[in-house]
Each structure stands twice: as C-alpha cells, then as structure tokens.
Amino acid sequence: NVMQDMRRPGCIQLLANQEWNIYEDNFHEAAGNPSYMDINCIDFNPLHPDTLFACGRTGLYKFADGRFIKHYSYDNSPLVSVFGSDKNYVVVQGLTFDSQGKLWLINSMNKEKNLLTYQDGTWTALSQNELSTLPNISHLLIDSRNILWFSNDNWQNPAFFRYDMANNKLYSTTNFINEDETKFTTYWLKDIKEDRLHNIWLATDAGPILIEKKETTKESPVLTQVKIPRNDGTNFADYLLGGVSISAIAIDDDNMEEIYHFTSGNSPLLSDNIESIAINDATGEVFFGTDKGLCSYMSNASKTNDEMTSDNVWAYPNPVKPDYTGLITITGLSFQADVKIVTSNGVLVNQGKSNGGSYTWDGRNRKGEKVASGIYMVETATNEGNQGTVCKIAIIR
C-alpha cells in the first residue's frame, strides 16, 4: 500500500484564547472534488499567519481565515496521482514553510517532480531521482542550518534524507549503524525534531535515535543510540527506550534527564496510541494527539529567551485568587535563570533555577507556609549572573 487508508474525514480545528474555531470542511461535496480525507500535516505561512496549507492522501489544500480557498491536485499543479487520474490518491504526506514564506512539500510516487516548492502562485520542481518511487515520504523539518530533513516512513524502504537547500544536494541514509558500529534494524521513521543544542532526533521503532550537531552536515552521519547506565556496579548500560516504537517526539528547553512514563492506566491520557505531540512554548503545556482525541499536560518547562525583559517575563495566574490551589508560573526566562521571590519590603520567600524558560512557585515561603496577601516581586538574573528583569505577583487570600 502507498499509505494507510484511514478514511478519516478531513477536519482542521484551531484553539485560540480558549476557544475552538473549526475550518470550513464541506467544500468536497461539490461535483468533481475528491473526498476530503486523511489530512495529516498543516503549517501556517509565517509571512501571512492567517493562511494555512494542509496536505494528506488527497492532495494539497489552502485556507485563509478558516475558509477554504483552493485544492491543488494533478490538474492544476505539478502534483501527480498514484493511480492515473484518481484525485483520491494524490499523496502529499508532509509540508513545511521556511522563514521566507516558501512552502516545501513532497509528492510521494511522483517520478518527475517529487520535491516541490510553492510561493506566490509559482511552483518550482527540485526533483530527486532517489525519491521517485518511495511511497510514504513525510515528516519534513527545516532545521536551524537550513537543512531540510524528511523520512520515508515505510517498512520496505526505511530511510531518512537531508537536503541542502542552498546547493540542491540530497543525502540519504538507508543503513542504520550506531556509534559502536553496530547495525540495527528499523522499519518505521515516524518523526524528526531538532533540540535546543541543534541535535536531531529521529522517532523509530528501534527507539529514539540521536544525530549530534557535529554529525548533521556529514555525508554519512554517526547515529547514536543514547545509553543509560544501569548504576548497579557494572559498566553495563541500556539504550534509551531501546526497542520501544516511538511514534512522535516533542522537545522542550529544560535540558533535563528526568523521564515520566504516562499511560492511559496511570494518567488522564486518552489512549496509549500517540500520533502527535506538540508543546506550547509560551506556557509549557504539552498536547497529545491520540486516536481517541486530544488531551494536554501542563509541564513546567517552556521556551527560553536569550534576554529577559519586562515585555517577555510574566507570571500567571495573576492575580492569584483565594480559590486557586495550583502552581504559579513565571515564564519567559533564560536558560537556567536564577529566580528570587521577595516581599515588597525585600524578605526572601522562595528561590531557585528556571526549568527551561519557566519557574514554578507553590505560593509558600521557605518554611512551607502559605504566604499572606500582598504584592510579591520576582527578581531574575541570567545563569552568568547578569541582572534580568522584575515582575510582580499579586496574591489574594
């Protein structure tokens, strides 16, 4: 099969300011349009944030302000169908915008024009022979070096690719050999992500695979299966999540080694079948897309800022009302920032280091007692000792 035919009706929903907006989805009912099915990737144009493109088994779709604008298929674009003139199988499994507003996408099974860009009504084909017969090219990522990464997520031809956008050169990896020169087998590559240190992570059925920053530009990069020491008096170690089939990866900025294992049995997670993960960088909220719906977990790590100013450092909830019993979060901090919380007359009640770009406080002093009503000052400094900014928290008891 070219791809798994899930027969899921197309649906795009946008959560903003605690309200859901549902994108137009009844346009496929017009004569001649294919079924609007199995949409699996979306991205917003960074130059026109109200414009969204979506793709999947039935081609490419453009929306603006939630309204359907255009469907791209074999009859109005370079895209081709796997089955001749069947619009239900114009397979576009991944897309992404670059910082200049250019859309990058790959049309699986297109022998002539598989790697494509689209901008301002103009299509450009950057075809690559190695991609001409691959059935499930997906998971596009443009990293901090302007390298385009993607994978063929198919058990018959598992591979990942790096495309040098500046020089139109493609590098492929089809043999999987780790840092110990041990060959390992993987059948699926479900996700690709970059971390804050500019390493690349691959989600595979053999576990997470790391490509260190220094390896990312090499023609044959070393693949690292991260080892976790057993700490049992031996020199033995186990691979991080070795043998666990990883379906999605999201990376926050906290650089911590602590691992939580959530299941539908020990948490409110809706299902153990995780299809996607995304993090709200501003708040640290982690969203899990499952086969039974969407749920979220409030972590205490958000995106770091290089500079802490009054414009990007703030606390929530604020004010803290009498019936609130959760944690108070200060966000917008730099990596491992020093945080001190003091009373209006300078008495220290709490201090610590940021976790990623956030710091959480339980509203208690150093004796474990709830602090009284009042205005509390949050003083910040960088990890190097440079003064940051100050924000205020109002507590009402």
Task: Please place each PLM-identified region on the residue numbering.
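Glycine-centered tight-turn motifs at strand-turn-strand junctions
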Residues: 348-371, 382-386
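C-terminal tail/sorting-segment detector
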Residues: 377-397
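Short, glycine-anchored, charge-dense loop/turn motifs used at functional sites
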Residues: 338-349, 376
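Carboxylate-rich, polar loop motifs that coordinate divalent cations or form catalytic acidic clusters
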Residues: 1-313, 348
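Short, conserved beta-strand segments of beta-strand-rich sandwich/propeller modules, principally
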Residues: 283-285, 372-377
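Glycine-centered coil/turn sites that cap beta-strands in beta-rich domains
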Residues: 307-340, 358-361
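Terminal processing/anchoring signals of secreted or surface-associated proteins
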Residues: 11, 301-306, 315-318, 346, ...
